[in-house]
Curated annotation (Swiss-Prot):
Organism: Neisseria meningitidis serogroup A / serotype 4A (strain DSM 15465 / Z2491)
Record carries keyword Transferase: yes
PANTHER family membership: DEHYDRODOLICHYL DIPHOSPHATE SYNTHASE 2, DEHYDRODOLICHYL DIPHOSPHATE SYNTHASE FAMILY MEMBER
SUPFAM superfamilies: Undecaprenyl diphosphate synthase (SSF64005)
Active site residues of this protein: D23, N71 (proton acceptor)
Protein name according to UniProt: Isoprenyl transferase
Record-listed E.C. numbers: 2.5.1.-
A GO term, aspect molecular function: magnesium ion binding
Residues holding substrate: 24-28, 36, 40, 68-70, 72, 74, 185, 191-193
Amino acid sequence: MKSSTQAVLEHTAIPKHIAVIMDGNGRWAKKRFLPRIMGHKRGLDALENMVKHCAKLGVQYLTVFAFSTENWRRPEDEVSFLMGLFLQALQKQVRRLHENNMRLKILGSRERFNRQILKGIEEAEALTANNTGLTLSIAADYGGRWDILQAANKLIAEGVSEITEDTLAKYLMLGDAPEPDLFIRTGGETRISNFLLWQMAYAELYFTDILWPDFDGKALDDAVASFQKRERRFGRTSEQLPIEQQRN
């Protein structure tokens, strides 16, 4: 009997870039009468598994929303724990990424991070900068509107007189990375919550009730299988699509 991963690989192309809002850590913990921080710890485990499975499938870019600009409003003890977990991941998990030829990038403002976290970010990005495997981008203290504004301000500061879509895109946090093909949100909510607003213009959206700590390889396979069944026309008619895409 074939595994779910093998079944996915026998269909059409795997999405080159997957973006994820990892929602549901707190609710996962609450259902088990555990403190919220335990949900975040299990969420980190789920991310590790997601990275491994994406690499196995052949996904080239994985971008996850870890901490938004709005998340600073959460209880102080929870924010403190999240920052500590972030630093722990930078210090320990980055070695595994590097050993597997994966690159790590951190997207977002760095103004509110302490020196220890900033140092961890710089060292992690430098260590993996030349790796050529999967690129894992973690959005931390990030917001889609903020991203567009910071890009516009950089263009103004550099005196760019004419701004095109391509020009603006290069100044966004994702830089030269391709736009996401597939967006996944766990936890049952059906909105994009200020995440990659510009870059997700043509992404296929996939929402699931599964809470993030429970999102495993099979759940990812199901999301990719759903993506592969969709007809991505980008404004064209079905008849204008390549023959290979029409067959799928």
